[in-house]
């Protein structure tokens, strides 16, 4: 796509050209719902973009035409084996779907059993768009906004989508859109911000070599999340050394991206961003704290480098503001944290309406890479590369339609019904139902 800097080669693009490069997508994309009260047109001086975004939000995501008869949810179970979680849903007609839960359910499973389970029983799964809206109202669940409800809710949604896909003989990607990407090109995500430059580089080189990655994201800044020491700081000067060193080490053909996880002030974010621009990085993720929306916009205005955000964002209207006000150029909803693929697709389609692109944040562990792949397969405004944290998992399963291997930086998306994999019954049998 002309005008888009993928982190490879010279960067001549400014933000307006970046937005223009993705223009034209908006006319092709239908969309899903939020409550009518939440999308009602406001004052006359309201940003005119909101009317367009609100119209997009009113359109459904789930391709309901695949289902001519009700699919009534009869049972919804959360299963646990040690620190592993599965979700199993069954319809009155005997259809079944399964999902793999995020490790965060170790702390959040009571929200599944108390706040979500009662709501979904007896509902028609074909109404999934509306269910994902109204579940926030039930029991004042919106008070649990963010990962606390998003992660359990996504676990429910993934299982329902797996069931619906098996009923219709369609992949999850086909249920939430048209297939645009039968293969997903990935970038290797790395961490190591607390380590020295030398040690970080060796670990990053190891990670890149393991999957022969063609694209890479590094961490910059000194967000010391891994310690209780309130005085802890990262290695001095690490960012200033890492940014040019990574480019020099991997060359101009490697697409590079950077993530600060909200570490910087506006001034320091712009300073770091200028260095990223100099060394041709493709985007700058979370330059300031995710909920500093005005400050994020200030950083975006101070750089030509695209700003990416969304891992921590929990609100559809939060994304709505960021998009309408050009605070970001790339949306990154996390399919787990944000409450599933349908809500995430709403974000992607809002972004597409204004020439912005989407690359989801990927939660590691479980089968997070599979949920990422199905979501990306249906993205009309997908970025060229998508986050990848490896294929390692404790889940025992079989996939008949994809080798699930990284070849030339790409992974083939499974084409079987639902998630496209069958979880080993012997593995499932190790799990016990979690009771309320």
Predicted features along the sequence, with ranges:
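N-terminal secretory signal peptides and thylakoid transit peptides that target proteins
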Residues: 5-26
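C-terminal segment of N-terminal export signals and the immediately downstream linker at the start
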Residues: 32-79, 96
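Metal- or metallocofactor-binding catalytic centers and their adjacent structured scaffolds
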Residues: 50, 96-168
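Short beta-strand elements
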Residues: 85-93
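Conserved, mostly hydrophobic/aromatic
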Residues: 94, 156, 169, 259, ...
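Shared catalytic-loop signature of beta/alpha-barrel
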Residues: 118, 123, 130, 134, ...
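Glycine-rich, aromatic-flanked loop segments that form ligand/cofactor-binding clefts
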Residues: 157-195
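Metal-dependent enolase-superfamily TIM-barrel catalytic cores that perform enediolate-based chemistry
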Residues: 183-298
